[in-house]
Swiss-Prot record:
Any Pfam family hit: Oxidored_q2
Key words, A-Z: Electron transport, Membrane, Mitochondrion, Mitochondrion inner membrane, NAD, Respiratory chain, Translocase, Transmembrane, Transmembrane helix, Transport, Ubiquinone
GO cellular component: mitochondrial inner membrane; respiratory chain complex I
Function, as annotated: Core subunit of the mitochondrial membrane respiratory chain NADH dehydrogenase (Complex I) which catalyzes electron transfer from NADH through the respiratory chain, using ubiquinone as an electron acceptor. Part of the enzyme membrane arm which is embedded in the lipid bilayer and involved in proton translocation.
Organism listed in the record: Balaena mysticetus
Protein name, entry field: NADH-ubiquinone oxidoreductase chain 4L
Gene giving rise to this polypeptide: MT-ND4L
Membrane-spanning residues: 1-21, 29-49, 61-81
Membrane topology label: Multi-pass membrane protein
Subcellular location: Mitochondrion inner membrane
Length: 98
């Protein structure tokens, strides 16, 4: 495993730790999810380029498309929640509260 792969895996794990620690605000959770998706994209692209696996060339692009869709839906949800509740706390998303 090269140093580049270790750095990308460390970036993914730091984003995961950030998602687990800073989950009170929706914006910080979305930023951590975006960091995880981008590190997965870079890792997939580098792995495919290094292994010369030509059948999976489209996999990083598909992952990037899903990341863009996730970001768009997350930002739309953030705008809706901040307009409705006035804050972006994740506790406001509990549907079981009356």
């Amino acid at each position: 495993m090269t140093l580049t792969h270790m750095n990308i895996i460390m970036a993914f794990s730091m984003s995961l730790v950030g998602l687990l620690m800073y989950r009170s605000h929706l914006m910080s959770a979305l930023l951590c999810l975006e960091g995880m998706m981008l590190s997965l994209f870079v890792l997939a692209a580098l792995t495919i380029l290094n292994s010369h696996f030509t059948l999976a060339n489209m996999m990083p692009i598909i992952l990037l498309v899903f990341a863009a869709c996730e970001a768009a839906i997350g930002l739309a949800l953030l705008v809706t929640i901040s307009n409705t509740y006035g804050t972006d706390y994740v506790q406001n998303l509990n549907l079981l509260q009356c």
